């Protein structure tokens, strides 16, 4: 496989397409009676790699992105997240992202289909440590400047 480092417009398009990976960290959760927690975090996107499986020079079916981003709360880095997003429909810009957030006290797994829309919804599919048995959803909003916000609603 050939690794391609993207620049310019291609990087911007793929960043919007493929960083549906959400981020969550040890932010102070807001507890509710049904044992739900809501975490509000900031996300700093890091460079990522597009693996061009068919060597055609652009995003196509089966190509994928590997990502690793930083998570912060109140201006302090408190975790990170990483994963992969294979392209499942290049015409529609559809990707299926899976990843894991590494946080103080445990990890949270996520996945889902997403597109280039600046707001992305993904499922929380489990966790370890203090997040063991967690489910829920995460909403990522890309701010267009290499940063984003993340709201994670956890249920047990």
Task: Name each model-derived stretch.
Residues 28-156:
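Beta-strand-enriched cores of mature, soluble protein domains
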């Amino acid at each position: 496989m050939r690794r391609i480092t993207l620049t310019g417009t291609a990087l911007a398009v793929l960043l919007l397409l493929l960083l549906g990976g959400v981020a969550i960290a040890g932010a102070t959760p807001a507890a509710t009676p049904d044992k739900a927690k809501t975490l509000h975090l900031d996300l700093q996107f890091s460079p990522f790699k597009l693996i061009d499986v068919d060597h055609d020079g652009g995003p196509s079916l089966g190509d994928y992105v590997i990502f690793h981003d930083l998570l912060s709360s109140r201006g302090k880095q408190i975790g990170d997240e990483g994963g992969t997003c294979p392209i499942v429909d290049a015409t529609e810009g559809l990707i299926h992202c899976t990843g894991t957030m590494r946080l103080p006290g445990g990890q949270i797994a996520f996945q889902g289909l997403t597109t280039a829309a600046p707001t992305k919804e993904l499922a929380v599919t489990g966790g370890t440590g203090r997040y063991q048995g967690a489910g829920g959803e995460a909403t990522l909003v890309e701010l267009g400047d290499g940063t984003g916000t993340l709201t994670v609603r956890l249920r047990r």
